[in-house]
Amino acid sequence: MRCPFCRHEDTQVVDSRVSEDGAAIRRRRRCSACDKRFTTYERVELNLPAVVKKDGSRTEFDRRKIVASMQLALRKRPVAADAIDAAVARIEYQLLATGEREVRSEKLGELVMNELRGLDTIAYVRFASVYRRFEDVSEFADVIEEFRRASPSKPPRKR
C-alpha cells in the first residue's frame, strides 16, 4: 500500500486486529522510506440502499457522512472512535437486513438517533436538535424529559 505521507510504494503491516464489532480489520502500517506509521481499515464492501432525500433526489449511501454526523454530535464527548464505527456498522446491518433498494433519509436519521441514544445522551440531544429542527427550548426539555422517564433516577453530580 502506498504511504499517505511520502507516496512510497513499500509499507509493512506492523499490527493487525479485528475491530470491536468484528466488521473490519484494523492494520497499523509503517513506511519503509519515511518511517511514519498510519492506520488502515479493511471491510467488506456492501451494496447498501440508495438514500432518498426529502426533495426526492437520490444519492448513494455514504458511510463517511454518517460517521461525520455522529462525530459532530459526539464532539468533546467521551466516546471512542471504535464505538462510533461499531454504531455505523449496526446501522449498515439494519439497512442491509431490510433488503430494500432505497431508504428515506428520515429513516436513516432515526437509525442514527437510536445509535446515539445508546452511546451518549448529550450527543443524542445535539443530533436531535438539528435533525428535528428544534425551534425553542421547550423541544429540548421534551427530549430531556423522555430520558428522565426512560431511565432510573440518578443522584445529582457534586461539583
From Swiss-Prot:
InterPro entries: ATP-cone_dom, NrdR-like_N, RNR_NrdR-like. Negatively regulates transcription of bacterial ribonucleotide reductase nrd genes and operons by binding to NrdR-boxes. The keyword Hydrolase does not apply. The lineage of its organism: Bacteria, Pseudomonadati, Pseudomonadota, Betaproteobacteria, Burkholderiales. HAMAP family: NrdR. One of its GO terms (biological process) is negative regulation of DNA-templated transcription. A zinc finger (unnamed) spans 3-34. One of its GO terms (molecular function) is ATP binding. This is Transcriptional repressor NrdR. Binds 1 zinc ion. It holds the Pfam family ATP-cone.
